[in-house]
Amino acid sequence: MQKGNIGVTTENIFPIIKKFLYSDHEIFLRELVSNAVDATQKLNTLASISEFKGELGDLTVHVSLGKDTITISDRGIGLTAEEIDKYINQIAFSGANDFLEKYKNDANAIIGHFGLGFYSAFMVSKKVEIITKSYKEGAQAVKWTCDGSPEFTLEEVEKADRGTDIVLYIDDDCKEFLEESRISALLKKYCSFLPVPIAFGKKKEWKDGKQVETAEDNVINDTIPLWTKKPSELSDEDYKKFYRELYPMSDEPLFWIHLNVDYPFHLTGILYFPKVKSNIDLNKNKIQLYCNQVYVTDSVEGIVPDFLTLLHGVLDSPDIPLNVSRSYLQSDSNVKKISTYISKKVSDRLQSIFKNDRAQFEEKWNDLKIFINYGMLTQEDFYDKAQKFALFTDTDGKYYTFEEYQTLIKDNQTDKDKNLIYLYANNKDEQFAYIEAAKNKGYNVLLMDGQLDVAMVSMLEQKLEKSRFTRVDSDVVDNLIVKEDKKSDVLEASKQEALSAAFKSQLPKMEKVEFNVMTQALGENGSPVMITQSEYMRRMKEMANIQAGMSFYGEMPDMFNLVLNSDHKLVKEVLADEEKECSAAIAPIQTELEDVTKRRDALKKKQEGKKDEDIPTVEKDELNDLDKKWDELKQQKDSIFAGYAGKNKVVRQLIDLALLQNNMLKGEALNNFVKRSIELI
């Protein structure tokens, strides 16, 4: 028996391995099964070039559980005592590297270029044994044992067949790995597509009301996964079946892209466009990254462009190591090339579907939209390509490319400053009246109700020359597209004041909601009262919900305009009745108010151009008193108008109709509206 110390520079290597080699201890199973697959593939390579002339036989890798042990067994090339000394005792040398160098033209399928992979066993084990016999003629089987210290033993043993058994004596604090369900889940996660059969226990079948083991190995992996095959050999059903295996609970994918590139990097895989039902779906299933069919991670940020991390599927590249780190991904040139390549393949595929089957593309647009919009918002190169196939949808359900839509609206939706005005709604039902008003003017209205449409609107205003997006409920229809300078409202100021004060007094108090009341001449057939919201302020608040650094806007109240149509019969009747009821009480207040205004204006004019210290205190006090008196008289007037409005059911009814149209009438206010409506009928 040989005893010795492992060739490391410090005796603290094992605690370091145990704690820091990999972030997840479960990785040990991936590493050891991958090593077993390596050894098997090496034997296949040697047989293919006639350096091994024996019988290959069954090459299945077996994983088995004992009371306190996990054993990984292969029938690969095995190791001699000298090879154990070189590859096991001298940490950081890897047999796969030497093997690749010697057989680089024939050994493309070797996984194990990871150096420290074997030592991951010590993350979960108090003792590890290697029982191995080389394929070489006359080789002596040996057993290597190490308890996690730098000391090891190496002795000759009897072993009938070539290959290697790795026996792990599991630590007391890692007993979870002795559970069949835990190992089964890890094998499914990491080894589902390894290129050599992996067996874990025996297949089971129902017999006499219970599950019993059969004699057949329970092979857990598909050795020739779909992405390794040629697209010409595959049917649509093959791709759909593979998707169902990857994501059993998901709907059928929209379509897929089969990737296969050999230069300047190696990459294969299949990416699927899933149906995204809600925000909850966005991170539920992720793209799986493999290295020569060994599962690496589902955190593919950096390898896949951000907007495509929403896709599903698999990527496989030997150019990305198993112990991949975020800093590696950010700096590696191959990774950047892969990301660019994937983005190009996706845009080419989308362009191809749009060009060859536009009907299918339009049918799937609502599902594709989030991917395409996300890409256009985050990647300039993708925007340049996607603008040719990205679509607008109008409220009638018709689809247009950007260019087609510009052609459609340029004659009728260009304002006096030569800006092209894109009208849009984000809820067909809630904004129905505004949409209909716009359509009655001959305008087309887009439906922009997607999760990213707020950001898209802002971006498109920057990208599309002399273009502006305006939501249909942001103003009265005549003001949405101003084609000529308008005459000012003909209603005199005192009448506007009376109307505004009456209606403002009856507006409901709502949390973080403010109203500005105004009058406009909108024609006899226009709505008597409308509620609009400034495009700018609404958009800023919407952006605050999705973009960091804009919380200021999110905290501001919602600002709405209550627009009174001075041409409408009902508004005229309210005004006439208000003047009749209030004129006697208002007249003396108005006379006094005009006198105060005249004196205040004269005093302000006298003080114009003077510094504050040059204005006599008496004048300052007088102006302050006049300001207070003006406010007091104004409040008296408003109180009289409010008293009138409180008794006039038509005022509150018109307000409630406008609120109801905007889905802003709820609870007690809605109940009162219904009662009042019955009384008025």
Curated annotation (Swiss-Prot):
Q: Where is this region: B?
A: 327-545
Cellular localisation:
Cytoplasm
Q: Which GO terms describe its molecular function?
A: ATP binding; ATP hydrolysis activity; ATP-dependent protein folding chaperone; unfolded protein binding
Q: Give a yes or no for keyword Cytoplasm in this entry.
A: yes
Mind telling me which GO cellular component terms the entry cites?
Answer: cytoplasm
- Predominant location of this chain? cytoplasm
- Disulphides: none
| Pfam families the record matches | HATPase_c_3, HSP90
UniProt superkingdom: Bacteria
What keywords would UniProt list here? ATP-binding, Chaperone, Cytoplasm, Nucleotide-binding, Stress response
Q: Where is this region: A?
A: 1-326
Region described as C: spans on this chain: 546-681
Work out whether the entry's keyword set contains Cytoplasm. Answer: yes
Checking SUPFAM superfamilies in the record gives: ATPase domain of HSP90 chaperone/DNA topoisomerase II/histidine kinase, Ribosomal protein S5 domain 2-like
Q: Which InterPro entries match?
A: HATPase_C_sf, Heat_shock_protein_90_CS, HSP90_C, Hsp90_fam, Hsp90_N, Ribosomal_Su5_D2-typ_SF
| Purpose of the protein | Molecular chaperone. Has ATPase activity.
Q: What family does the database annotate?
A: Belongs to the heat shock protein 90 family.
Q: How does it assemble?
A: Homodimer.
Q: Which NCBIfam families match?
A: PRK05218.1 (NF003555)
Name the UniProt record assigns to this protein: Chaperone protein htpG
